[in-house]
Amino acid sequence: VKEALAQVAADPAIDLAEFDQEDRYDLNGNGNRDEPDGLIDHLMIFHSCVGEEAGGGDLGENAIWAHRWNLGAPYPIPGTSSPNGDFGGQFAAYDYTIQPIDAAAGVCAHEYGHDLGLPDEYDTKYSGKGEPVATWSIMSSGSWAGVIGGTEPTGFSPWAKEFLQASLGGNWLHGSNVQLADLNPRGNVYMLDQANDKGRNDDVVRINLPAKQVPLNPPYAGQYQYHGGKG
């Protein structure tokens, strides 16, 4: 990542100020996130190899797996200058996404979804149980949809859309809110518009489930036992 940033800094045709329009973390604490802060807003790096998630090509397991992460701390970019932020008068980079140069739209959109705060919706533990959303979401295996994998990714899940609206603002997602107890055993009918068509019907239908009941093993002896707070 730092090598890529050095290449960017050395290119006179690139004005990094164009990519610093947001104060995503409100670094100066003034409540305004719509202002430059010295950090590159959305750093997307394309590496020149097949991604490990697609087999890795000649590099195999030594290839880079597409991911979103950060540099541990803001990294001032040598050879740059910025009047904003507190990075020694330089532009800085912090979080990033990286994907292969031959990445299809699905991988790029999936990683950018992480950049917007969305988590993976696939079974990251590979437990064998899989995930219910599967190809219905680009944050799951929907990022690989299409005759040529990843060229026709599916959309974001209802949960992801709700998250994006809540975190980024807007009033474009509307739908019914239903309690589980109100569902009719014989079925309920709700009209949904297609995801690519904004009509008068619901965009989503949310069914509120009760809190998950997690049975615990009884104490070995007595009435109480210690719990580690995890698991």
Give the ranges of each region predicted by the language model.
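Extracellular hydrolytic enzyme modules, especially secreted metalloproteases
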Residues: H42-M44, S48-G231
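Extended amphipathic secondary-structure runs
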Residues: A4-I14, E35-L43, S48-E53
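Surface-exposed, low-complexity/disordered Ser/Thr/Gly/Pro/Asn-rich loops and linkers
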Residues: V1-D15, F19, P185-M191
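Acidic, glycine-anchored loop motifs typical of Ca2+
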Residues: E18-D41
